[in-house]
Curated annotation (Swiss-Prot):
Protein source organism: Leptospira biflexa serovar Patoc (strain Patoc 1 / ATCC 23582 / Paris)
Protein name in UniProt: Small ribosomal subunit protein bS6
An annotated GO cellular component: ribosome
CDD domains: bS6
A GO BP annotation: translation
Family membership: Belongs to the bacterial ribosomal protein bS6 family.
Annotated keywords: Ribonucleoprotein, Ribosomal protein, RNA-binding, rRNA-binding
Its biological purpose: Binds together with bS18 to 16S ribosomal RNA.
GO molecular-function terms, A-Z: rRNA binding; structural constituent of ribosome
Gene: rpsF
InterPro entries: Ribosomal_bS6 (IPR000529), Ribosomal_bS6_sf (IPR035980), Ribosomal_S6_plastid/chlpt (IPR020814), Transl_elong_EF1B/ribsomal_bS6 (IPR014717)
Keyword Iron (UniProt): no
A Pfam family per the record: Ribosomal_S6
Amino acid sequence: MRNYEITNILREGNVEETKSAVKELLSKYNFTIQGEEDWGSKRLWHPVGQDEQGHFTLIKCSGSPTEVAKIEHEFKLNVNILKTLVIRANG
């Protein structure tokens, strides 16, 4: 098990539903959520499609390295997630 930090930019409007979908997806792939931060809505540096605002979240979790690519793929399929960054955390 490795530690990861997942930063998501969510589409405005149904933020809570998307956050719960992200948590369900992580539990589906046996990731354990250790912490969560909500950074709020911010104006994007450049538009993503037609969206100029995004809701930023950070999730600290741990899980298997073999499942990370699957999670990233599932995030890309969700239309309410504008951008995702998954990094391996120290420790």
